[in-house]
């Protein structure tokens, strides 16, 4: 069985030339979808800029970690997962889905 490489999301606002799609693509993005993607991209760029400035000593206290003061009892057993790993396992073994 040949496994194809896992695709990665690129947030630089540009698509690689090898990833261009033909006009007959079934995927249609609405203006609202494109606006949401643009908003998330721009917001993330601001976070990354603030984090870089904070690390380099230019700004202090701009980016901070949110910690719940009163954690929910239902989340005590929550264990974070690596979504890339989950996708990789799903792609490698499609019979289990």
UniProtKB/Swiss-Prot annotation:
The keyword Transferase does not apply. Residues 1-29, 72-97 are annotated as: Disordered. It is found in: Nucleus; Cytoplasm, Stress granule. The keyword Transmembrane does not apply. GO terms for biological process: regulation of epithelial to mesenchymal transition. Residues 82-97 have a biased composition (Basic and acidic residues). InterPro entries: MCRIP. GO terms for cellular component: cytoplasm; cytoplasmic stress granule; nucleus. It holds the Pfam family FAM195. Residues 17-28 have a biased composition (Polar residues). Keywords: Cytoplasm, Nucleus. Belongs to the MCRIP family. May play a role in the regulation of the epithelial-mesenchymal transition. This is Mapk-regulated corepressor-interacting protein 1.
């Amino acid at each position: 069985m040949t496994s194809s490489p896992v695709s990665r999301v690129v947030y630089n606002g540009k698509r690689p030339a090898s990833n261009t799609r033909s006009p007959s693509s079934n995927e249609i993005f609405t203006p609202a979808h494109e606006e949401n993607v643009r908003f998330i991209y721009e917001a993330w760029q601001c976070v990354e800029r603030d984090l870089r400035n904070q690390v380099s000593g230019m700004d202090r206290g701009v980016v901070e970690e949110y910690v719940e003061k009163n954690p929910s009892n239902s989340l005590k057993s929550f264990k974070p997962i690596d979504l890339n790993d989950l996708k990789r396992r799903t792609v490698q073994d499609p019979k289990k889905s």
